[in-house]
Amino acid sequence: LVPGITKEFNDIDEAMRLGFNWAKGPFEMLEEIGVKNFFDKVDEYKGNKFLENLSNSKDENFYGERQKYTSIETLGKIKKTASSVDGNSSASIYRFNDFNIVEFTTKANALDYDSMDALKKATDKPLIIINESMQFSAGVNLTYTMEFANKNDFKSIEKFIKYFQETCKHLKYSKYPVISAPSGLTLGGGFEVLVQSNFVASHTNIVIGLVETIVGLIPAGGGCKEMLARWLNTEEAKKDPKYAPLKVFDIIGYGRTATSPVEAEPLKYLLPENKRIMNRNSLLEVSKKILNENKDFKAPNELTFNLPGKAVIDDMNKILEKLYNDKVILDHGLTVAKELAHVLSGGETTKDKTLTEDDLFKLELDAFMRLIETKQTQDRIKHTLATGKPLVN
């Protein structure tokens, strides 16, 4: 195996631990036994060049000094050494000398007001958003949202969405860099946190996307805004002002998801510069390395948008008319899609008018609030929470 498959013993140990759920790899165990004890128990090794060389070496340990085994620094290990622990019932903040970590702690790491509060409080230093559980975040906590909707307390929902937007903008333009290190589900609001982080170190096992339309809503935490920005930054969009809104309309409208970084990149859920990590246990180490490489970090400039308004709405309506006539979407599906179209078009604007990020946030918020107040969207959410399946209405 060494050096035929890999040059490092660590790689073999890592593969055996991850593949067979072992506590220690074979070379780690031999390291603990020691070279002398190992050969005291081995009867035949003549003819095996590797074992002969090892037997003749003067190393006391199996790895030797140069290849001494060093375990990977995972979240589970490092958080025990935090200088302080802060947070609430939805997220924990682990504070270290030169950076902070936020770990979501709700079921499926669904996001609520407290989750956002923890993120905002943790930006007083460079921040890594990472979880020990298998999911990054399944999105906004719909149960939390419906508790307010059932009481017709839509002002509380609006307050939460505004705070979500405010927090995500704060992450993006913080004095210090923010890194998201996702694994598993990274959907809806979870994606919106990621896309407004400054850096991404993504596990290759990831399910990522904006799926709000499935439950009768539209992304309202910056998802529409950021996807527009990414697609506007293409050669096609520079030639055709309708290109980016139509592309994002298709992606968000169908609730498209990707199941790997390779699939996510063509949708622009992830970008070429985002790190991809095969070993989930290495997410924290890679994130810390990114921080070390960006000591001179400066926050990006705020985005501006020039969107075509009614000119692209007409094209979107033609698409929706065909889908509706073909019964691909029903009455409320049409309503949701029209709200999405209004946001992505820029609303009452023309391509000569410049919109700010706050303008796009306002469009997202208004559309979200109009939808959450409808019985049909509430029916979709209740059905999904009860069955785990979408309701088509």
Give the role of each language-model region.
Residues 1-41:
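Helical "substrate-binding/catalytic lid" subdomain
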Residues 15-19, 267, 387:
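Short acidic/histidine-centered micro-motifs embedded in hydrophobic/aromatic stretches
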Residues 23-24, 109-111, 135-139, 186-190, ...:
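Flexible loop/turn segments at secondary-structure boundaries
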Residues 28-32, 39, 54, 61-64, ...:
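Glycine/serine-rich phosphate-binding loop and adjoining beta1-alpha1 elements at the start
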Residues 32-130, 232-256, 260, 266, ...:
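Intrinsically disordered, low-complexity segments enriched in small/flexible residues
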Residues 97-103, 113-155, 162-181, 203-207:
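A structural preference for short, pocket-lining loop segments at secondary-structure junctions
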Residues 157, 165, 169-303:
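Conserved catalytic cores of soluble enzyme domains
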